[in-house]
A protein has these predicted regions:
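An N-terminally biased module of ancient metal coordination in phosphate/nucleic-acid-related enzymes
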Residues: 1-65
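Active-site gating/metal-coordination segments in enzymes
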Residues: 4, 53-169
Length: 170
């Protein structure tokens, strides 16, 4: 593919996972090679690390005019205060913005996250304060709300999805 055909248009990648600071140079090299003008690093819960936000903000500091960071919510609220997650998450928004995040990444709608976390229904009263805060503040959200239907069908699911543990059928 000749990317020069798209040269008059800025190329923005709205959804990049940044796994570890050891990948900083590699990620920046890839974005430069692909002529990505700006990109958004999304921070999701990680079973092996407390938070990806500090690493993502460090990456953003390398190129603040090019990189956005969407911080993830502190999922411990699902265990500590399940009936009050909306209040807890609403309070986290100001903290995320103050640290340099530009928005929020929610992966709680992904089926494997819903199996791992006691996430209340998104339209439940527990989430109301959070949605009100997000609406009033106009903070952008990247919200993973499900996975493709073939991830429930053993005959249709791609092998790469099975390898990642994303088969959800019986």
């Amino acid at each position: 593919m000749n990317l020069n055909e798209f040269a008059p248009f800025p190329l923005i990648d709205g959804h990049i996972h940044y796994p570890h600071p050891s990948q900083l140079s590699r990620l920046l090299d890839i974005c430069d090679r692909l002529q990505i003008n700006r990109f958004n690093v999304v921070c999701t819960p990680d079973r092996s690390r407390l938070s990806l936000i500090p690493d993502a903000l460090h990456l953003k500091a390398q190129r603040p005019q090019q990189i956005y960071v969407f911080g993830g919510l502190d999922i411990s609220a699902y265990f500590r205060a399940p009936a009050e997650v909306g209040q807890v998450f609403a309070a986290q928004i100001d903290q995320l913005l103050a640290t340099g995040c530009d928005g929020v990444k929610m992966i709680e709608g992904k089926p494997d996250m819903r199996r791992m976390l006691p996430v209340p229904p998104f339209d439940s009263p527990a989430f109301a304060p959070y949605w009100e805060k997000m609406s009033a503040s106009q903070v952008p959200i990247v919200f993973h709300v499900n996975d493709p239907e073939e991830f429930w069908d053993p005959k249709r699911i791609p092998g790469w999805a099975v390898e990642r543990g994303w088969f959800y059928g019986d």
